[in-house]
Amino acid sequence: PSVQGAAAQLTADVKKDLRDSWKVIGSDKKGNGVALMTTLFADNQETIGYFKRLGNVSQGMANDKLRGHSITLMYALQNFIDQLDNTDDLVCVVEKFAVNHITRKISAAEFGKINGPIKKVLASKNFGDKYANAWAKLVAVVQAAL
């Protein structure tokens, strides 16, 4: 699907679920960002190869570069949430975000591996499958840009 087409799948209910869960997840960008990244690495060890510049990712919060990447990731998600009501603007920021991943030759399928860690981080905050499915739809918008 096109990026526009994927963005069109973000219904009012999906947007509400994204916003409701983001209120909690986004309130601790550093902690939840590091949790997201360390879960990605634990569950998909082959993804560590894309992040060589981060050094020893098993250090978690003690790794400055991992913390920095995690915080940057969370602000990108904040940007996506902020643009949910304007599809054209959402597409613009998603395409900008995608450039960094295209440069690193991260495919849509590889990028989709973030869905599992998102589901786990959401579950740790008592957000179930409905919320994980909403985030998977947002991830699909990024995947369409890759």
From Swiss-Prot:
It comes from the Eukaryota. One of its GO terms (molecular function) is metal ion binding. This is Globin-1. It holds the Pfam family Globin. Belongs to the globin family. GO terms for cellular component: cytoplasm. Signal peptide: none annotated. Homodimer.
